[in-house]
Amino acid sequence: MFKFNIDNPLHKLHKIQSKVSEINTEGGSGGGDGVDEIKTINPATETSLGVVQLSGVLKGTATNPELSFNCVKSNHLSEECVQYNHIQKLSKASLLGQTTKSGGNITEVELNSGLILENGKLSLDLPSIITLSDVMATKSELGVITLGDGGDLNGSPNVNLLENGKISNDPVIGLNKVTYPKIQKVTGKSLLGNSSIFDDNVEEIKIKNGLVLEDSSLSLDVNTLPQASSTTFGVIKLSGDLSGNASSPTIKNQSITSYKLAPLPKHTILGSLDNTLSPTPISLHKSLGVVNEQLKVNPKEIQSTTDSLGTIMLSGDLTGTATNPEISEKSITYSKMQSVNGTKVLLGNLSGTGNISEIEVGDSLILKNGFLDVDLDKLHEESILKVESGGTGNSVLPLGYLKGKEKDPVESVQKIPVTDIFPNVVGSVNGVFPSKPGGNISLIFSNVTTGILSEIPSRQVNGTIYIISGDPTPTNNGRTFISDGTNWNEVTNHLGSTDARYVQLAGSTMSEDASLVFPSTSNIILNQTSFSNKDAVTKEYVDEIKINDATVSSKGILELSGDFDSLSTADNPIIKSATPTVKGKIQLAGDFDPLSTSSLPLIKAASTTSRGKIQLSGDFDPLSTSTNPIIKSATVHSEGKIQLSGDFDSKSTSQFPLIKEASEVHFGKIKLAGDLSGNADAPEIAHNAITYSKIQQASQKSIIGNAINGATDIGEVVIGNGLMLSSGGSLPTVGTLSVDSNTLPKATLNSYGSIQLNGDFNPLSTATAPMIGEGKITYKKMQQISSQRKLLGSASLPIGIQPIQEISVGPSLTYSGAGNNILNASTSFFSGTNPNTSPPTDRPTTSNLLYIGVDGSVWMWNGVHYSKGPGALNVLKSKNLYTIGPLGTPSPLSMSDFDIKVSAGQRIKIKYILNFQSTGGAEYAPSFGWNGVAQEDFFQASIIGFFSSSNTSSSFSTIYQTNTSFTSSSRQVTGGANLFALTSTNADNNLLAWNVGTPEQQLGGIGGQAIPIYITAYYENNTNKETILEIVFNRDLKTQTGQTIQIAGGVADYVTY
């Protein structure tokens, strides 16, 4: 059963009232805990309880509130709102009413004779108005009645007969005699009872929210009971995260979201190490971790070792992917390879395909120090390959050279052919042949000179070249001559132009590579009729020697195709060799007799070792002829011909006898193909040949495997509980083996098993990503906080997702709100510079709270108003001159450089250091005052100056203090508004206490040596408005005019406190 504690504001108010009463009784000043707690109660409304203010229709005090006169109108009162005990006590037995027709206030109405009011009953006093007789009372007539004698009435006529127990030693109403109809009617749905804690009369008790009175039955009305909230007790409905019934409420499935779970220590999960325990935090081994709200294996922490299984990384000797790991290139070093058996062993593959295997090194090879070579010492005669076969040979070679001929045997030559040398050798240069040895050619190069033709020099050495240049005859320029040692020989005949780059044909050119280019419209015409080997020839000559295509009747050229072999060349035409399908040349060898000629080919006679011609005898039938040879029929005792029937295929011929192929009904030949491989001596079933349909049928639903440790035959493995083998699909996959969640054991508190993702799980949960539903982790399901002033969160650095943990609330944070469920800092920001004029909206008038304005000012509530808190040191500097001349004007001077704004309620401390200068002596002293000080403010200042000859032996102080009774003819006091304002000329100041006529020290004059004046002032602005505190400078009342004094700047610093 649920129990509810309803937080009653009236009860809370009653407690607060008791506190206030205690404070008032003890002489307290008000405020305190009781007042502050009252402020937390909301104002009363028509629908909710709360505090009210004694105004309007109410007056009096908090402990004795009263209704104001004539304040209650007929429309103000709701039904049954004024209870009996709310009405003013009457002075005697009387009634309330109004006796005048004109209306008025309700007053006491006295009872005349004949009426009696006793114990809440107004009745007739019959003895005072009538005389009773012996006439008995009836329903229609007055009369006497008898008390007692078994009737329903007892007692006496003058006593409330219905007040049981009030009449002593008198007759009373008998038990069970007051039936329900005889009891006074109630005004509405109500009960009779006593609501006070003391003995009292029975009264009507109205049915309020939470109760219902129907059909003489009183019961709870849950619809009108207060509903539970986060701050108050009340009724709830089994919805949201709850289900079940009132006697056994349960949390709905899928209602526990991840955010509702109790916080866990870092690197832990929920679980149970014993099936009898509730889930508890279980520390995760470093090999496990939570990533993106999923529990995952940390492969780095379960690394494989030589002693244990574990994970590895695809690095080092491995690469690829987890599903397709590969060995890295060049990672298989020699030391990692399998050791070979024996010595002189190599690794390789002799077949071209297949696995690498060991290959022994033969005797003719030597393997030493990592080198494989031919062991010449062990080579013997018969193993040497002859030279003509491409080997080294040991035969005697003729003098000369060996020349390879591709597939043909090598041959020896005495001289290397010139055509075999690349590039081709040089035969001679200008008739000079190479010399031996080395083949060098000696060439003579001489000078090349230029000049005109008439100045060609005398005979020069062989090879000298002379080129005509700058000749008066332009056509001579370019002519070239070369000397042979005796004569000059012109290189190019003169053809009208000596430039050898051109030919004398319009549009024709000759390039540097000696290519002649002629226009397409020009021709070269040759008139020759006979030609040497290197001459250009005419078309007519070519046409005459042209050979036409060969025909049956004429010779000519032909194409080496058709019956010619594809290897034919013009120098070596080859006729194709004959084949069974192609006609061609044959060689009279093999089956031909050696005596065969091209005109008489003879076939060899057949023998037991070779084919050939035979004689039709022996196994041939006597009826055989050359055109019809007949083999004798075979018998049991002799060989012979047989009929191609029976086991022979119907397609058999004598040339191709075919045995029938094997079938399911008879024997026959088969081919090692399809499902078979290997050879006739060792046939094998081919790989992947045993398809699923060829395997023996199972006797029941099962899978094929081996359930026994060790090697054994494959058999049927029956599907057990927790597994399901479903059919469906198409070949090759016709079924699916999966976990059968219906037959898996269900999880309990004591055993592992399957669960269904409903209840407190999110509807979107999957087996791989189960999620607790939103709103399912209620506060009651979470782990309790270990102590007060704790929050839940993450105090770690913001790196990744951190576990939730308890966070202590520091002393600078406070709780507020009706249920202390609002966490705030000890600061409150307001939109203004002065909370007295711009009241804060966040927790106003709260002690121990800092209020910060938009200007950064800090304030505190002192119980009466806001005061500015202590601040940093503020410094004011001035370089201005405040000068009062010899005539005493202007006087006084306001030194505005040192003005300080002081907010209402703010307190400050100021230190001035002012630089005083004067043209006179020490008797010309200054005087100071302050503007902006009100009479109700607090102000005190002390001024110290040094005016002795040593600047240290004498110091004099003047004290300024707020005093409303202080008067002075030299001070202007007008209602205290400007207590320290100076007069228009000067003021009285006791800064100097020695004889005025005897100056102690001559000052340095204006602009000379200055004397420091130190002033310390304390000021509190007790007004409700901001003011400007301003220091004022004047000459002292005792000083004389005729001299100039000034303040040459200075500095002031102030702080708030």
Curated annotation (Swiss-Prot):
Pfam families: DUF5907. It comes from the Viruses. Belongs to the IIV-6 261R/396L/443R family. This is Uncharacterized protein 396L.
